Amino acid sequence: MKPTKELLNEILHEVRPLIGRGKVANYIPALARVPAHKLAIAVYTNQGEVIKAGDADEAFSIQSISKALSLTLAMGLYQPDEIWRRVGKEPSGQAFNSLIQLEMEQGIPRNPFINAGAIVVADLLASRLSAPRQRLLEFVRQLSGETHICYDKVVAASEMMHSDRNAAIAYLMRSFGNFENEVIPVLNNYFHACALKMSCVDLAKTFSYLANKGVSVHTDQRVISPVQTKQLNALLATCGLYDGAGEFAYRVGMPGKSGVGGGIIAIVPGEMTIAVWSPELDPSGNSLAGTKALELLSERIGRSIF
């Protein structure tokens, strides 16, 4: 079965009762103000068709979903060993902003999708790009075809004001020799990436290269190689949902990346890219209703990588 607008509307109707059972991220004040009732899903097929339902054109803070975009940029700038000697490829099983594991493993983050790993990627970008923030924005606008996409400066400033833990992570890595640039400018770039504002339609178009062997469906341009696409999807499948990655693989069965803004992207290699949004989170920091929507979609259309 293929996804249809009717099916997407049906799924949103089924998951809407979950709203009220999760919690909107409140440690970033600007995110705490997002209305909890928002709900959206968008599918972008490898034939270039958009199928959507709910608030699919409304932009929101993508937060950690941006980590997959930053890693994609880094993969185009560095040889594999230059990246993977500084950050691992294993699930962490710890909170996404944990310091304990980082200390025990001598400043090498478990994977590029927890905060420590994404901060290392931001450091890598700062070493090779004169204006990493502008480059990321241009990259996203190009892939989505939407020039209106921008950083939410209020969210970025809010995160910078509440950045003590992430700063501690960066300085701890620097103490182990795993940091090259000044900490504060790198953190500023990292928070701006998290503060990208995009809709589900924007996200589904942007990440279409992961469903199409590294070639953007929207622009028909190669973003990364087929091998890099396989590697990135593998990391998304094992590490993309914080310490809920196993649960997500079990229920949804697709490579994915979540953010505490309530968004999740999911990939069906060779077929489609999916984005969902519902701001209320489960205890792992993943969208509660969004995860359920992806689970139902996976079941109804019979798609899974397993």
Swiss-Prot record:
Enzyme type, top EC level: hydrolase
Signal peptide: none
Gene3D superfamilies in the record: DD-peptidase/beta-lactamase superfamily
The reaction(s) this protein catalyses: L-glutamine + H2O = L-glutamate + NH4(+)
Annotated binding of substrate, by residue: 64, 115, 159, 166, 190, 242, 260
Keywords noted in UniProt: Hydrolase
Pfam assignment, any one: Glutaminase
SUPFAM superfamilies: beta-lactamase/transpeptidase-like (SSF56601)
Biological process annotations from GO: glutamate biosynthetic process; glutamine catabolic process
EC numbers on record: 3.5.1.2
An example Gene Ontology molecular-function term: glutaminase activity
Oligomeric and partner information: Homotetramer.
Matching HAMAP family: Glutaminase
Family: Belongs to the glutaminase family.
Family matches, as NCBIfam families: Gln_ase, PRK00971.1-1, PRK00971.1-2
Annotated protein name in UniProt: Glutaminase
Organism: Vibrio vulnificus (strain YJ016)
Gene of this entry: glsA
